[in-house]
A protein has these predicted regions:
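Solvent-exposed alpha-helices and their adjacent loops that cap or buttress functional pockets
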Residues: 61-62, 141-142, 157
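Active-site-proximal catalytic alpha-helix in oxidoreductases
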Residues: 106, 149-162
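Extended, subdomain-level signal for the structured scaffold at the beginning of enzyme domains
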Residues: 1-99, 107-111, 127-129, 137, ...
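Structural detector of well-ordered beta-strand residues that form the stable sheet scaffold
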Residues: 99-100, 121, 138, 149
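A conserved active-site-flanking secondary-structure segment within enzyme catalytic domains
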Residues: 115-144
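Short pre-catalytic strand/loop immediately N-terminal to key active-site residues, enriched for Gly-Thr
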Residues: 94-95, 143-149
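Generic recognition of short, well-ordered alpha-helical interface segments
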Residues: 121, 125, 156-159, 172
Length: 230
């Protein structure tokens, strides 16, 4: 029987559900995996769609974990100033064997002080903010820096989780899981990265961020100041 391997998904309101359900689908297949969904308040959580998740534990009830996973989403704007959430990331990250993130989750790791001087991936429309926290932005889909694995936007979380699985359980296990979930991306359009997308598509995608850009930038500036003052 495999030894227990504890995985904590540190959630917050208005996450993008695929940011954590993608890696969750992969990582639950690790031998001995025991996955916990947790948030500051625990209980029920609403994501950035109509979906809700219930039965979450409170983050302060989780003592430690082998792997910490931090998703992203528009809720990052509020979470980056949630000191209880950031404190939980610092506490769990200090003992974790692996620290991971998906999408804008790397910005939350950065705000918690866990990425200082590191390289990290992030959603393409947000990754420039990593530099504000002293983190080197990397456009790769998955970036590893020591025990830290960061994924780019949303779907990159599956790639990140498979790389982590290969590190922990070996390539054969990772490839077997990839086949089991039939992860063989073949999108109908070649527009999944900003450098590949047509200009009208890129403009439309950037426009989605406009509604929160000012709020985001102000929140991140305060988060940087708080981290510098710590």
């Amino acid at each position: 029987m495999a030894a227990p391997f504890d995985i904590v998904f540190a959630l917050f309101p208005r996450i993008t559900q695929l940011d954590f359900t993608g890696p969750y689908e992969v990582l639950t297949r690790l031998p001995g995996a025991r996955c916990v969904l947790a948030s500051v308040e625990g209980g029920e959580l609403e994501v950035d769609s109509v979906m809700r998740f219930s039965g979450l534990r409170r983050l302060d009830s989780v003592d430690e974990c082998d792997l910490l996973c931090v998703p992203g989403g528009f809720g990052t704007v509020a979470a980056v100033e949630d000191q209880a959430y950031l404190a939980a990331l610092r506490r769990l990250g200090a003992k974790a064997r692996y620290i991971t993130s998906v999408c804008t989750g790397s910005l939350l790791l950065a705000a918690a002080g866990l990425l200082k001087g590191k390289r990290a991936a992030c959603h393409w429309a947000w990754r420039d903010k990593l530099a504000d926290f002293g983190v080197a932005q990397d456009p790769a889909r998955v970036v590893r820096d020591g025990i830290i694995f960061t994924g780019g936007g949303v779907t990159a979380g599956i790639d990140m989780a498979l790389e982590v699985m290969a590190e922990i359980g070996g390539r054969d296990l990772a490839e077997t899981v990839q086949l089991a979930i039939e992860y063989a991306p073949a999108p109908p359009f070649d527009s999944g990265r900003p450098e590949l997308a047509r200009e009208p598509v890129l403009r439309a995608a950037r426009a989605r961020l406009d509604s929160v850009r000012a709020e985001r930038d102000a929140a991140f500036a305060r988060a940087v100041a708080a981290l510098d003052a710590a």
